[in-house]
Amino acid sequence: MAKFQAPVINDNPLGWGPCAVPDQFKDMPYQPFSKGDRLGKVADWTGATYQDKRYTNKYSSQFGGGSQYAYFHDEDETSFQLVDTTKMQKTAYQRNRLRFAQRNLRRDKDRRNMLQFNMQTLPKSAKQKERDRLRLQKKFQKQFGVRQKWDQKSQAQLKPRDSSVEVRSDWEVKEEMDFPRLMKMRYMEVSDPLDIECCGALEFYDKAFDRITTRNERPLKSIKRIFHTVTTTDDPVIRKLAKTQGNVFATDAILATLMCCTRSVNSWDIVVQRVGSKIFFDKRDNSDFDLLTVSETANEPPQDDVNSLNSPRNLAMEATYINHNFSQQCLRMGKEKHTFPNPNPFIEDDVDKNEVASVAYRYRRWKLGDDIDLVVRCEHDGFMTGANGEVSFVNIKTLNEWDSRYCNGVDWRQKLDSQRGAVIATELKNNSYKLARWTCCALLAGSEYLKLGYVSRCHVKDSTRHVVLGTQQFKPNEFANQINLSMENAWGILRCVVDICMKLDEGKYLILKDPNKQVIRIYSLPDGTFSSDEEDDDDDEEEEEEVEEEES
């Protein structure tokens, strides 16, 4: 009968596991292993049987392999060392080596592609298409100034512009208005203009200038006539009107500067005088306010040195000189005139009337709401007659070409007759602020037409001799739409400035356009600022006393 035999149990009273190693397991070699090891070998007792070092540790167990590097705490700290793990600073050559290598590879690849393209045989039609493509590409690069470089180092860096007047430490900022906020303003409660007085005499526009082309250009003459650029408070007519009507007074040039200020780039300033409840907008004596800027709004405006022929100030003086001469040369000088009821208020008794420029002054009045009564002195430069004999007033201005190689310009002698739209588009881009001011002045004066003359240098390096290449005529309302000039926004800007000035105390203030930011600021000026001598101060005090007496 089978019986159960209990196995021999080795009891270890002092711990776990067997008391002794069985005889069959004595002297048996053993290597620590892990269950996650790959099973790709039978045995490897030495670890040095592989010739290729890449496979040394591929199939060997890593169990316990790092025990020799284990740290055991001991009283002796001499074996402990700190290792510097900071990265080595690369030299400029090492940093740019990869980028230069990639650029060289691209350049070599482009050369190989170009060589391969030149060696292949193309049919005549394909060759013609490729020549046309290259020609158009060069044309666009020249016209729009395309840069093929990855950086912009080749472009001229814009210099910081100077302020039109130095801001002193004792001037206090009363208000600051940024252009994005002004561009959103609208004002539509503007009454129709009312003519108060008309002064001066106008000469007839010579229509022969409308037939001038680049093939029969006409030299620009130097005409010695007197142009009066009188500020608001020095105008005797405005002084007389201020006693009976109006509470805001200005000239059309000053108002156009404010109404179109969001297009301006250069710095300008306007003096504001608060006398009682009346406001006078003036310009400073001996300032550059009446100079015409050139390429002010271009992407790369002229930035030559002061002594250079094409410095901003020299170009502005040249443009003003051209504008004065052309506005008189295109008239029938010394012949029939259109005379207004009142004479020119700025002609002195000892001055010959024929030496005074053809200009008429129209004093007009607008109502801006119930509290603003605006009186403005506007100007006309000439007049024309229609088929039925009706009289049309004209404002005459001039665009001048100084060097077509700059400011992405086009050659007028090649494009003016065939592509006049491209010429006016380029001028609108480079002289947006100047064209907007001229259009605004024509709208304020009520002129039926705006005449633009195209005048160029005889040679790009000679700023003393010029030729007339053509003329162009616009209606101010239509031209305002073409140049995207919104009169609602212009009136809104003016109303905003007037409201701010109405809240100021009596005194003298300055509206200054920041030379390098799209911001205009209003500063309060101490007494006596911008006063040339004591006589000017006495005249201002007498004027203030007269206005206060009328108000009382």
Swiss-Prot record:
GO terms for biological process: cap-dependent translational initiation; formation of cytoplasmic translation initiation complex; translational initiation. Belongs to the eIF-3 subunit D family. Residues 288-302 are annotated as: RNA gate. The gene is eif3d. mRNA cap-binding component of the eukaryotic translation initiation factor 3 (eIF-3) complex, which is involved in protein synthesis of a specialized repertoire of mRNAs and, together with other initiation factors, stimulates binding of mRNA and methionyl-tRNAi to the 40S ribosome. The eIF-3 complex specifically targets and initiates translation of a subset of mRNAs involved in cell proliferation. In the eIF-3 complex, eif3d specifically recognizes and binds the 7-methylguanosine cap of a subset of mRNAs. InterPro entries: eIF3d (IPR007783). Residues 526-552 are annotated as: Disordered. Component of the eukaryotic translation initiation factor 3 (eIF-3) complex, which is composed of 13 subunits: eif3a, eif3b, eif3c, eif3d, eif3e, eif3f, eif3g, eif3h, eif3i, eif3j, eif3k, eif3l and eif3m. One of its GO terms (molecular function) is translation initiation factor activity. Keywords: Cytoplasm, Initiation factor, Protein biosynthesis, RNA-binding. It comes from Xenopus tropicalis. This is Eukaryotic translation initiation factor 3 subunit D. It comes from the Eukaryota. One of its GO terms (cellular component) is eukaryotic 43S preinitiation complex. The keyword RNA-binding applies. It is found in: Cytoplasm. The keyword Cell cycle does not apply. The RNA gate region regulates mRNA cap recognition to prevent promiscuous mRNA-binding before assembly of eif3d into the full eukaryotic translation initiation factor 3 (eIF-3) complex. Residues 532-552 have a biased composition (Acidic residues).
